[in-house]
Amino acid sequence: MGDSEIQYLLEKLKKLEEDYYKLRELYRRLEDEKKFIESERIRYEREVRRLRSEVERLRSPPLLVGVVSDILEDGRVVVKSSTGPKFVVNTSQYINEEELKPGARVALNQQTLAIVNVLPTSKDPMVYGFEVEEKPEVSYEDIGGLDVQIEEIREAVELPLLKPELFAEVGIEPPKGVLLYGPPGTGKTLLAKAVANQTRATFIRVVGSEFVQKYIGEGARLVREVFQLAKEKAPSIIFIDELDAIAARRTNSDTSGDREVQRTMMQLLAELDGFDPRGDVKVIGATNRIDILDPAILRPGRFDRIIEVPLPTFEGRIQIFKIHTRKMKLAEDVDFKELARITEGASGADIKAICTEAGMFAIREERAKVTMLDFTKAIEKVLKKTTPIPDLKGVMFV
C-alpha cells in the first residue's frame, strides 16, 4: 500500500471522526430539547387539569346558607334556611360533628338540602378593620416620665401573656383589664402603642365612638363581634380609646340615642365580666373623663387595675424634652432644666409641639441648629394657645 493510499485513508478517518462528533453533539441537543418538551407537556397537562377543575367548580350549582337550630338524637339536624322555613336534613360524613352546634352557619345542597360545609361566623367588615396589622414604632424608651405607669401596665398586660406560669405558681388570676385615665396629651394612647409594639399578641384598636351606631342593636353587635374576633385570634389585646363615649354614667334620659348608647355599654359590661370566660384577651381602656364613667365599669373584675397618667413632673418634662430633641441639632445654650422649669403644667403633647415649633423658628431663620431663644418663643406660642379661654358668658360684643 502506497503513501498516497495511506494519506487518503487517514483523511477519510479524520472526516468520519468529525462527523461522529457532530452527530453526537446533535444527539445531545435533541435529547435536551426532548426533555424540555416533556417538561412543558407535563406542565401544560397540569394546567389543563387545573382549568378543567376550575370550570367544573364554576359550573357547580350554588349552595344555600342556613343556620343550625337543633341537633336530633339520630344525627339529623334541624336547619333554618335563608329563605325562611326550617328543614330536618342529613349531614355529610366529612363534616366535623363538633363544629355542628346551634347557631352555626352551614352550606346546604340546593336539591337535597343536606349540609355539605360549615361556614365561619359572620362578622361586620368594620370589625376586621379594627385589627392593627402593622405594629406601631413607639417603644417604652419613647415615653418619658411614666416609669411607674409603664411598670404597672406591663405587669397587668404583658406578663400574663408572656409568663402565665408565674400567676399559676402564686395561685392568683392575672388582671383582666387596665384603665388609663388622665388629662389630654399625657401619653395614654402612647402607652397602648408601646404595648402593641412589645407584645406578639393580636392588637385590636377601637375608638369608643365607633360603637355608637344608628340602629338599635348594631352597637351591641359590634361589641360582641370585636370580642369574638379577639377570642379567635388569642392571645390578643383590645384597646378602647375614648371609653367615655359609650361608658358614661347611666341617666333617666328619654332620648332613643342615649338609650342605645346605654344598651351598647351593657353589652360591653357583659363581655368584660360575663358568663363566658375571655381567655387570653386583655382589655386596655383610656379616658380623660373618669368622673363621668359608670360605676359598674370601674369595679374590679372588669378593669382590675386603674392607672392614673398625670401631667409630667419636673424630671418627667426633662426626659420628654430629651426624647423629642434626640434627632434635633441643638445649640450649646439649650438648658433642659430651665425648659422644664418654665413649662410647669405642660403635657407631653405640649412639649412635643414646643419642640416642633422651636425647629420651625430655626428653619424660618435658615439655621441648622435650634437655640434656647427658639424654645422660649415656642413655649410662649404653644402654652399661650393651650391656655383655657376665659368665660365670656353674659358679655355682649358690639
Swiss-Prot record:
The UniProt entry, under InterPro entries, shows: 26S_Proteasome_ATPase, AAA+_ATPase, AAA_lid_3, ATPase_AAA_core, ATPase_AAA_CS, NA-bd_OB-fold, Nucleotidase_PAN, P-loop_NTPase
Recorded hits in SUPFAM superfamilies, A to Z, give: P-loop containing nucleoside triphosphate hydrolases (SSF52540)
Compartments, as annotated in UniProt: Cytoplasm
Organism (species): Archaeoglobus fulgidus (strain ATCC 49558 / DSM 4304 / JCM 9628 / NBRC 100126 / VC-16)
Report the GO terms under cellular component: cytoplasm; proteasome-activating nucleotidase complex
Give a yes or no for keyword Nuclease in this entry. no
Report the protein name in the record.
Proteasome-activating nucleotidase
**One of the GO BP terms on file:** protein unfolding
Task: List the Pfam families.
Answer: AAA, AAA_lid_3, Prot_ATP_ID_OB_C
Where does the secretion signal sit in this chain? none
CDD domains membership: RecA-like_PAN_like (cd19502)
Please indicate if the UniProt record lists Transmembrane helix as a keyword. Answer: no
**According to its UniProt record, which protein family does this protein belong to?**
Belongs to the AAA ATPase family.
Primary role: ATPase which is responsible for recognizing, binding, unfolding and translocation of substrate proteins into the archaeal 20S proteasome core particle. Is essential for opening the gate of the 20S proteasome via an interaction with its C-terminus, thereby allowing substrate entry and access to the site of proteolysis. Thus, the C-termini of the proteasomal ATPase function like a 'key in a lock' to induce gate opening and therefore regulate proteolysis.
Query: Chief subcellular site?
Result: cytoplasm
